[in-house]
């Protein structure tokens, strides 16, 4: 998982009055120094997400992360989609570059008989899968809103 999604989670926690150190057990600088340019293992991100849900007592935290985190929390995805000339192009950008944010997720657009369906599949299933998919889908909803949908 890209550290960008961790920043989104930390943004929402700070909005709810929870310090990053309470979630991480160390300073934010120490964590990013440890990770460097590497991605955060998905199991570690899910453990942090579970801890964040417990700290905030908010079961829909993944949804809130996707809806209320700053645009900067989504890294290059926000400016790439905002520069797309059409929604179809923006969705193509998302499907092309989403592996940079998280492995194990497949986003696809299918169109049939005038109906467009956007699907987000998460490989593997565990109790936190719902929160994780909610985070991703909420980010997609933000993009749809930017296109007036």
Q: Where would I find each of the regions flagged by the language model?
A:
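Cytosolic nucleotide-utilizing catalytic cores of signal-transduction proteins
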Residues: 104, 108, 129-139, 143-149
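N-terminal low-complexity or simple alpha-helical regulatory segments
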Residues: 1-119, 139
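A short interface-forming secondary-structure element
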Residues: 119-131
